[in-house]
Structures are given as C-alpha cells and as structure tokens.
Amino acid sequence: MPEPIGKPGDVHDRGTGRVPGPAICGRRGPLVGVIDHGSGNLHSVCQALQKAGAHPKLVSETRMLSAVDAVVLPGVGALGTAMANLRRINGVQQVQELVQRGERPVLGICVGHQMFFEQGTERDETVDGLGCLPGTVVPMPTSRLPHMGWNTVHPPADTALFTGISGERFYFVHSCAVVTVSPCALAHVEGDAAALAHTGDDATDPETGTGTASPGAIGHTAAGPESAHAMTGRNGHPVRTTTTCHDGCTFVSAIECGRLCSTQFHPEKSGPAGIQLLRNWLAMV
C-alpha cells in the first residue's frame, strides 16, 4: 500500500517490498495524489497508476494536494457515504477549486466519477455532489443490477481520454449512474441500435476470476440533433460524454471536461485498455 503523501518513502507493493517510482525521461513520472477519503479501491488504483508511468501517493489531508501534479478521486459504495467522507477530511472545497482552476488533471473513478455531478438520489434521498458537471446520479432503471462485468464504451471522436483505444471493453461494478445528462448529451453516439449491441456483459472479476457471464442486451441511441458539446462544466470547458448501454439503459460511462476526467468503470481493473486510458490522462499533466 502506498504511504501517505508528506512522509518519506516510495510506493510499496504487497509481497515485494519497496517499488521505486518509474523513470520517464530520466526522472520519475508525475506525482499523482490519490485522495484517501475512506472509500476507494486504493491499492489497485495505485498499482495501475504505477504501470501507467506515474508515482502515486495517498493523500488524506487535502491541503497537500497543492504538492502533486495530478489528482485521482476514487470511490466505491454509496454516493452519500463518499461525499460525507470527503467532507470529513475537508476536501469538498479543495476538489471544487482544483477543477475550477484547471491547473492539474483530475480523475474520478466509479463513485468518484459520480461525485463530480450536481446531485444523486439513493433510498429516496437527495445527495448533493460536487456540482462540477451537469447531471444527476440515479438508480439504473433495469432489473439486472448491479451492472457488473465487462462492457463496451462509445466515446466521441475528439476525446483525448480514449486516444489509441478502439473497440475495447472496460470493467464496471455499479447500480447507479447518470442515465441522462440532457437529451443532447447522448446524441454523439453514431449509428443505429445495432451499433451499440454487444454480445454480453462478462461478469468475471478481472482480479479474482470469479463471476458468471450474463446474456447480452441490445442497446439504443438517444435521439436529438444537438451536439454533446452544447454543455459546459463548472470550469467553463465543453463536456465530452462517453456512453455505455446495459440492458437497454444508456448511461454516462466517462466524461472529459478540460482537465477534469471521470469514468464510471474501473480503469485499474480493465487490463491494458485501462492502463492506456490512464496514460492518456497523465499526458494532460
């Protein structure tokens, strides 16, 4: 497990001892602060960042975020719990300001992705998010929950986050999502419903090898002539929306908005495609 930022020492790998930071052009890669708010797949995230060429450090005191080159906000479980944990470490305003200034790349993963939106609903209660992106997180309107396993993504043509990634699948584990940002947000998905069809969600966990494959579902596109770039985030940049279909439900699976990026899927569990996505994000440093 990586040591907290501000303490001497490099990232540690369970079972192998000390692991030196990767060398890029004769030096270590970007110093990435992984926010430890008590809800996140921290060990796997840090290992994946190392493979992508970064030097990850856990940050439990958000005032230390000024010392890093980029920031990851991970999260698992419930949105309300994750937001409460972030408030507990006085991180809400700091993360909002990071996104607003746009000086460092910021990446949200899974519930961390959901935290950047305006609000969410869970158990008939409304939870305020960080408000950096337009949209509401809701329980997905399908009986096949959780959405767990491998699935395809459909990014817009001009996204930097998916450069060099085509036709790959990513690993999802979630029951809530931003099903609709606005009618125009999903309009970039080209082609007819067949273009979004997939052969099935492989529910095998890439780390444990457990799980089963579930039947496939035919996707659908959202109607509307408007461009997804009609929306802007709090930082003033256009919102580039990537979508995924599960059991007939199209939802937002990734966002790129200036130097703010977020993914509903887990890049750290998504094999080579996930590592390439992290490299693309690190290129924004």
Listing of model-derived features with the role each one plays in the protein:
Residues H55, P105-L107, R169:
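Structural signature of beta-strand start/N-cap positions in the alpha/beta core
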Residues V68:
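An anion/phosphate-binding loop that grips the pyrophosphate of nucleotide cofactors and donors
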Residues I24, G135-V285:
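Amide-donor transfer/coupling interface in amidating biosynthetic enzymes
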Residues C46-A54:
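Two-component/phosphorelay signaling modules centered on CheY-like receiver
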Residues G29-G33:
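Extreme N-terminal starter segment of soluble prokaryotic enzymes
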Residues G77-W150:
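Cysteine-nucleophile active-site neighborhood
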